[in-house]
């Protein structure tokens, strides 16, 4: 029961900066599982051999996974807490002008796709004008 409470507390905390790593790992495992199931389904005459090998592999892999599955999550939480501490230290020591500059850079980056879209939409009209200038009024 105490383990369930610890698991719920650990899941509730979440990762502040490295949550994407956990999401990417979940996505990779799901994709690999789907590819494996597809390959197993399409193995044709090799299907009985795949089924025979799959049993012993599961008998070895499942206990190992159950024994060591907490390690990557704990390591990821440790690294995330280290990143949080580093960001806090850096945030305290940076002068305000650097913080303002980084905010301006982020806003410029966020505005870049819209600027590119507007530029791309205006290009066809400009190329027609240039074609008329170079090739005459036809």
Swiss-Prot record:
Q: Which InterPro entries match?
A: REF (IPR008802)
Q: Which UniProt keywords apply?
A: Acetylation, Allergen, Cytoplasm
Intracellular or extracellular location(s) = Cytoplasm
Summarize induction of expression. Answer: Induced by tapping. Not induced by wounding, ethephon or abscisic acid treatment. Induced by ethephon or ethylene.
Distribution of this protein across tissues and organs = Localized in all laticifer layers.
GO CC term, one of those recorded? cytoplasm
Residues bearing the modification N-acetylalanine: 2
PTMs per UniProt: Not glycosylated.
Query: Pfam families, per this entry?
Result: REF
Q: How does it assemble?
A: In solution, able to form amyloid fibers and aggregates rich in beta-sheets. Interaction with membrane stabilizes the protein, inhibiting the amyloid state and aggregation.
Q: Outline what the protein does.
A: May be part of the rubber biosynthesis machinery. Plays a role in rubber elongation.
Listed name of the protein: Rubber elongation factor protein
Species lineage: Eukaryota, Viridiplantae, Streptophyta, Embryophyta, Tracheophyta
